[in-house]
């Protein structure tokens, strides 16, 4: 599906004073002509596909804007399947902006929309939709495990899984439709065996959905709030988990007067630890502001660690804090100071540890991952994203309805209705059955330049 216009955008992250090199990407019929117009190459350098040339970008008054390398990739041997030019210029906001503005002033060139390069790759058959989504997920990966799963998708893991399941359903649909049209000429169809095969596909789809939900923790990370009355060791626990002195640790109540954050990775899961100010009654205006932010962190956390003083035991303040945790948010009761004699608790705690000595830390990590559904991701080969999970769940529901049709002993043509729906949903995962409007919605979530 050749495009009539040429798009351009910065394909690398740009920040003030950061990054030695930036890449400006062009794709479309005017890409090569634009590259030749914008980049002036000294000497007799040979232009060719997949060759690099050296030159300068010059403004309308003949002044050099930047020293660059240009890489031409003629279609269809390119990411988008179209003629693609990459201009490698110096990094930094100003240098990149000047070169991009020069590119966008050329005839037939416009600024790319978010995800438009990947969308063209899909429309031109260079990528299936799951691989295109994996590119975006690889760029956004916040941990090595998330990057590994994204690479599995980029290598075709998701596409292969879904294609196999879809082909199994297509085989069954072929059998059913043959019986509808030529039942008298064919041997009887074993409906029970057919149902077993549909049930097997449904169970595999449901497992993919469950794995994908765990994969979300790897992609998006978790927000974990450390809550407790003052001086129970929340800041010590934050420092223990993050392996650095992120919070000031003293024996004075109210030392943490604001919300502190620390980014860590536990068992491949990116986690934002929120060390909240001790929630208590106070006349200190600054501390009151920190407490208000702590309460907001409670409402937005994926899981709450209620840190208790294991030496002092359970108090009325602990009970009040437990009651303030929203009911729908998982919570873990952590008795800190396990290196000291234990106090009394009216209910069992989930984890006993010493933030100072490190004992019990592994138990806390395991409890945290299990409570938020992020445990057991090591054996996962692929992880469906939200869009893919919704479609896989829709296919599984359609297959469940086919069992209801069988129970009612309806004719074969009734079976085909839900089977076609399941096949269509799986085709939407890989992009085999998608409208351009749906593609626009999918790629609008991508970064510009991807």
Curated annotation (Swiss-Prot):
Question: Which Pfam family, an example, fits this chain?
Answer: TrmE_N
Where on this chain does (6S)-5-formyl-5,6,7,8-tetrahydrofolate bind? 25, 86, 126, 450
Q: Which GO terms describe its molecular function?
A: GTP binding; GTPase activity; metal ion binding
Biological processes per GO annotation: tRNA methylation; tRNA wobble uridine modification
List the subcellular locations. Cytoplasm
Which positions in this protein are listed as binding GTP? 231-236, 250-256, 275-278, 336-339
Cell inner membrane recorded as keyword: no
Which free-text remark accompanies the cofactor? Answer: Binds 1 potassium ion per subunit.
Q: Which cofactors, if any, are listed as required?
A: K(+)
Task: Identify the GO cellular component terms for this protein.
Answer: cytosol
Name the EC number(s).
Answer: 3.6.-.-
Cite the entry's keywords alphabetically: Cytoplasm, GTP-binding, Hydrolase, Magnesium, Metal-binding, Nucleotide-binding, Potassium, tRNA processing
List of residues binding Mg(2+): 235, 256
Q: What class of enzyme is it?
A: hydrolase
Q: Which InterPro entries match?
A: G_TrmE, GTP-bd, GTP-bd_TrmE_N, GTPase_MnmE, MnmE_dom2, MnmE_helical, P-loop_NTPase, Small_GTP-bd
Tell me where in this chain the TrmE-type G domain is found: 221-373
Q: Where does K(+) bind?
A: 231, 250, 252, 255
For this protein, the record's NCBIfam families field holds: mnmE_trmE_thdF, PRK05291.1-3, small_GTP
State the family it belongs to.
Answer: Belongs to the TRAFAC class TrmE-Era-EngA-EngB-Septin-like GTPase superfamily. TrmE GTPase family.
Q: What is the annotated quaternary arrangement, including any partners?
A: Homodimer. Heterotetramer of two MnmE and two MnmG subunits.
The UniProt function text for this chain reads: Exhibits a very high intrinsic GTPase hydrolysis rate. Involved in the addition of a carboxymethylaminomethyl (cmnm) group at the wobble position (U34) of certain tRNAs, forming tRNA-cmnm(5)s(2)U34.
Name this protein carries in UniProt: tRNA modification GTPase MnmE
Which organism was this protein described from? Synechococcus sp. (strain CC9605)
